[in-house]
Amino acid sequence: MVQVIESRFMSSASHLDNAPPPNASEIVFLGRSNVGKSTLINTLLNKPLAKSSSTPGKTQLINFFASVWVWHNQRLPLTFIDLPGFGYAKVSKTIKKEWERHLLNFLFMRQSIKLFLHLVDARHTDLAIDTSVATMLEQICRGDQCILRIYTKADKLNQSALNALYKRVYIQKNKVQGVDTDDTHTQSLLFSAISKNHRKMVSLTHLREEIVKYTLGLENGI
């Protein structure tokens, strides 16, 4: 079982040049605006550190959070990176393209990133923007990195829709609108920060353990 010893906000950055120097393994959160990134980060870190804007897509900063976890008596300093939500940004196309270029450069050049957490709204699983992100991650993912796709807000699905998504994710090994993600670098999980002990959704305890294993390279033989 993973214990969260401490968590704190580190700093914000607009691009790679003014990001804090890497001093721990890093986990990056990507997802559309309002997909639940802030909620998931705060739940994982056991502290309300990530703030969500009332205007979707308004925040254009990369936020860094430091946390110390203990797993099997091993002390693990980790850095969690919250990227700006994509899809709803109310900015000009020129600014948006420049913003996306900086983010892609950050993801590609930041050698300390070990795990990408791609959050997808369980109610809207085949949006073009998520397909683009899935494709991009598959293209830039290095041999020492992994991708963990987390379907959020699964508690909002009715039983029939939940069963269908469960079958797609765990039995059919999940494809996101034609993008084959069934490889050693990618895994998908159903999660809800609200529902507890639901047999079709992973628990918070299990999710933390999966994050640790993927970050350390234990799940794909790194």
Curated annotation (Swiss-Prot):
Binding locations of Mg(2+): 38, 59
Function noted in UniProt: Necessary for normal cell division and for the maintenance of normal septation.
NCBIfam families: GTPase_YsxC
Residue ranges occupied by any EngB-type G domain in the UniProt entry: 23-217
A GO CC term assigned to this protein in UniProt: cytosol
GO-annotated molecular function: GTP binding; metal ion binding
Domain of life: Bacteria
Binding-site residues, GTP: 31-38, 57-61, 82-85, 152-155, 191-193
SUPFAM superfamilies found in the cross-reference section: P-loop containing nucleoside triphosphate hydrolases
Protein family: Belongs to the TRAFAC class TrmE-Era-EngA-EngB-Septin-like GTPase superfamily. EngB GTPase family.
Name of the protein described by the UniProt record: Probable GTP-binding protein EngB
Record-level GO BP terms: division septum assembly
Cofactor: Mg(2+)
Gene name of this polypeptide: engB
CDD domains given in the database record: YihA_EngB
Keywords: Cell cycle, Cell division, GTP-binding, Magnesium, Metal-binding, Nucleotide-binding, Septation
Native organism: Helicobacter hepaticus (strain ATCC 51449 / 3B1)
